[in-house]
Amino acid sequence: MPQRTALGNILRPLNSEYGKVAPGWGTTPLMAVFMLLFFVFLLIIIQIYNSSLLLENVQVSWTAATA
C-alpha cells in the first residue's frame, strides 16, 4: 500500500473525478473555439513579424532603438 502524505491528502480531491467522462461532446466545442482564437492570434503575430501586416505609424525594427 502506498504511503500517505500530507501533500497527497491535499491533492486527492483533484483526482476524484478520474475516469469519469462527461456525456456527449462535453466542452469540446469550447476547446475548439479557443484553439481557433489562438490560431488567429499566432497568424497575426507571424504577419507582424514578417511585415506582411502593416500597421500605420508602427515601425518594426529588430535593431536597438536609438534616442
Swiss-Prot record:
GO terms for biological process: photosynthesis; protein stabilization. Keywords: Cyanelle, Membrane, Photosynthesis, Photosystem II, Plastid, Thylakoid, Transmembrane, Transmembrane helix. Disulfide bonds: none annotated. It is a single-pass membrane protein. PSII is composed of 1 copy each of membrane proteins PsbA, PsbB, PsbC, PsbD, PsbE, PsbF, PsbH, PsbI, PsbJ, PsbK, PsbL, PsbM, PsbT, PsbX, PsbY, PsbZ, Psb30/Ycf12, at least 3 peripheral proteins of the oxygen-evolving complex and a large number of cofactors. It forms dimeric complexes. One of the components of the core complex of photosystem II (PSII), required for its stability and/or assembly. PSII is a light-driven water:plastoquinone oxidoreductase that uses light energy to abstract electrons from H(2)O, generating O(2) and a proton gradient subsequently used for ATP formation. It consists of a core antenna complex that captures photons, and an electron transfer chain that converts photonic excitation into a charge separation. NCBIfam families: PRK02624.1. This is Photosystem II reaction center protein H. It comes from Cyanophora paradoxa.
